[in-house]
From Swiss-Prot:
CDD domains: AdoMet_MTases
Protein name: O-methyltransferase
Pathway of action: Antifungal biosynthesis
Function: O-methyltransferase; part of the gene cluster that mediates the biosynthesis of the tetrahydropyranyl antifungal agent lanomycin that acts as an inhibitor of CYP51 and blocks the ergosterol biosynthesis.
Database matches in SUPFAM superfamilies: S-adenosyl-L-methionine-dependent methyltransferases
First-level EC class: transferase
GO biological process: methylation
PANTHER family, A to Z: GERANYL DIPHOSPHATE 2-C-METHYLTRANSFERASE, ZGC:194242
MF annotations from Gene Ontology: S-adenosylmethionine-dependent methyltransferase activity
Domain of life: Eukaryota
Family of this protein: Belongs to the methyltransferase superfamily.
Species this chain originates from: Pyrenophora dematioidea
């Protein structure tokens, strides 16, 4: 088995600086996979699937009007803008990509000016935010990038008020399954350290001040993203296209790769 690197926040930020535009092109403006209700017959567009994934996270977060919500790994702001406008909340989005901040601030300038949205550079493992300053948080495919997940979850817990919810959507690896060489190119391309199991993530949450309320594995419902990536790889061509297609093939065939929707409460 090849050794999996432990990317730093700087490494992850550089990757997103370079690949965000491609990712948002693939995923209809979002930087997360979609949720297909019928993965065996995925006729839904990537637009509908990514919006449904956002809704799955939102339904578990249950924000109320006037609340201040933290978006951990905000990408270019599409998820934050959607939630802020539909639920009358204010959102602070953090990312380690300067390019993402620039795009988010420009795209949602009107919402930024009204104070509904704020985008800033911040590492979740060292959050420069005040204690108990948020009413909820969500993290969509961002915890997976962090080389110290305990530190990240501890920091998120610190900035949440007691009783607040944390809604997570992320990749996991089945318990006892070694991280296979088959997805080594995925780890390298997307700057992801060794994956952990859903049970390990729940354990970390419990140890860092959360009570897990729900955790469901929806791995089959995200599988069609591999076809989307393969198609984009054909369109892009070159080395990038070849890598995208290779990643898609590796992920599609890896049954041990899970994807969870989890919600926890700050105790």
């Amino acid at each position: 088995m090849s050794k999996i690197a432990q990317p730093t926040a700087t490494d992850v930020g550089a990757m997103y600086d370079n690949h965000t535009d491609l990712m948002t092109d693939i995923m209809a403006g979002f930087i997360h996979v979609g949720y297909w209700e019928d993965p065996e017959n995925p006729t839904e567009t990537i637009e509908l699937a990514t919006e449904r994934m956002t809704l799955e996270v939102l339904n578990r977060l249950r924000p109320s009007p006037g609340q201040h919500i933290l978006d951990v790994g905000c990408g270019t702001g599409k998820t934050a803008a959607s939630i802020a406008t539909t639920h009358d909340v204010s959102i602070t989005g953090i990312t380690v990509s300067n390019h993402q901040i620039e795009v988010a601030r420009k795209t949602y300038e009107a919402l930024v000016e009204t104070g509904k949205l704020n985008f800033q550079y911040a590492d979740a493992m060292q959050l420069p935010l005040a204690n108990a300053s948020f009413d909820g948080a969500y993290a969509i495919e961002s915890i997976v990038h962090m080389n110290d997940r305990r530190a990240a979850l501890s920091n998120i817990a610190r900035v949440l008020r007691p009783g607040s919810r944390l809604s997570i959507a992320d990749l996991v690896l089945d318990d006892g399954c070694p991280d296979p060489d088959a997805i080594a190119n995925w780890h390298e391309l997307f700057q992801v350290p060794a994956l952990i199991s859903a049970d390990k993530l729940k354990e970390l949450l419990t140890e860092t001040g959360f009570r897990v309320l729900e955790c469901v594995d929806i791995r089959q419902h995200i599988r069609p993203i591999c076809g989307v990536m393969d198609k984009k790889g054909l369109q892009v061509g070159g080395e990038v296209g070849k890598t995208l297609r290779g990643v898609a093939a590796s992920l599609h065939g890896l049954e041990e790769l899970g994807y969870i929707l989890l919600v926890a409460e700050r105790v």
